[in-house]
Every structure is written in structure tokens, then in C-alpha cells.
UniProtKB/Swiss-Prot annotation:
Transmembrane segments: none annotated. This is Large ribosomal subunit protein uL16. InterPro entries: Ribosomal_uL16, Ribosomal_uL16_bact-type, Ribosomal_uL16_CS, Ribosomal_uL16_dom, Ribosomal_uL16_sf. GO terms for molecular function: rRNA binding; structural constituent of ribosome; tRNA binding. Belongs to the universal ribosomal protein uL16 family. CDD domains: Ribosomal_L16_L10e. The gene is rplP. Pfam families: Ribosomal_L16. One of its GO terms (cellular component) is cytosolic large ribosomal subunit. Part of the 50S ribosomal subunit. Binds 23S rRNA and is also seen to make contacts with the A and possibly P site tRNAs. GO terms for biological process: translation. Keywords: Ribonucleoprotein, Ribosomal protein, RNA-binding, rRNA-binding, tRNA-binding.
Length: 140
């Protein structure tokens, strides 16, 4: 699973999922990409599940880049614990996703293969996303 090696602070505030991303909105490596169209949190398990779905479909052809990283700790309190007594301990890691953020990139395969691989990956993710190509970005 993806997680930071070391963090400055063990726990973080929840925050608000508003606005648009400042970076990570254009294809940087591949010819095709999966772009988020709504905001949400992606768990490290969900990121990995989508990656596995894509790699299994494209088999040995092509290259995949993961453009997101879970760097926000989620805390949880143990089951059957009374309220109060402070914030819970870090439980899992999430990545904050805003609309327009590129999640994955791919190259070395045809557009049909890439489109189907990203469709399979999108089913594993809790945020709505769309398929984009490098030519669409250059034209628009």
C-alpha cells in the first residue's frame, strides 16, 4: 500500500473539499489519462485496486503512471469506545482529489485498449472520472 515514509505531524484536520487543483491537471508522461470530475478522498487500497485492474487488462504492453499519492492520515477510534478522550490513532492514508486532477496516465497501447483499461479502473474508484487524450488537451 502507498503511504508516506515519514510525516511532520501524525494527525491532520479533516479539511474541506472545495476549489480546483493548482497542479496535476495536464498530462505529463503518457498519451492517455484518467481525470477526476468530482472531489473526494481516494484510499491507498482503492488506488492500488485500480492500478491492478489496469495492469491486468493491458497485460505486458504499455506503461502506467500513478499521478496521485495518499499523504493525508485518517484517524479512527476503536470499536465500542465512548466519546471524548481525544482524537483516534492514525488508521489509513488518503489522497484528496479535486475536479480536474489527473489520476493515472498510460502510453504504449492503442486508444481502445487504454479506454477499456481506464473504464475498469474507474469502477474501482469512488470518484467520477473521464478518459482524456493528449490531442484533446492540445486542441481545447
Amino acid at each position: 500500500m502507498l503511504m508516506p515514509k515519514k510525516v511532520k505531524y501524525r494527525k491532520q484536520m479533516k479539511g474541506r473539499m472545495t476549489g480546483t487543483p493548482q497542479r496535476g491537471v495536464e498530462l505529463a508522461f503518457g498519451d492517455f489519462g484518467l481525470q477526476a470530475t468530482e472531489c473526494g478522498w481516494l484510499d491507498s487500497r482503492q488506488i492500488e485496486a485500480a492500478r491492478i485492474a489496469m495492469t491486468r487488462y493491458i497485460k505486458r504492453g504499455g506503461k502506467i503512471w500513478i499521478r496521485i499519492f495518499p499523504d493525508k492520515p485518517l484517524t479512527s477510534k476503536p470499536a465500542e469506545t465512548r466519546m471524548g478522550k481525544g482524537k483516534g490513532s492514525p488508521d489509513s492514508w488518503v489522497c484528496v482529489i479535486k475536479p480536474g486532477r489527473i489520476l493515472y496516465e498510460m502510453e504504449g497501447v492503442t486508444e481502445e485498449v487504454a479506454r477499456e483499461a481506464f473504464r475498469l479502473a474507474a469502477h474501482k474508484l469512488p470518484v467520477a472520472s473521464k478518459f482524456i487524450t493528449r490531442t484533446e488537451i492540445n486542441e481545447g
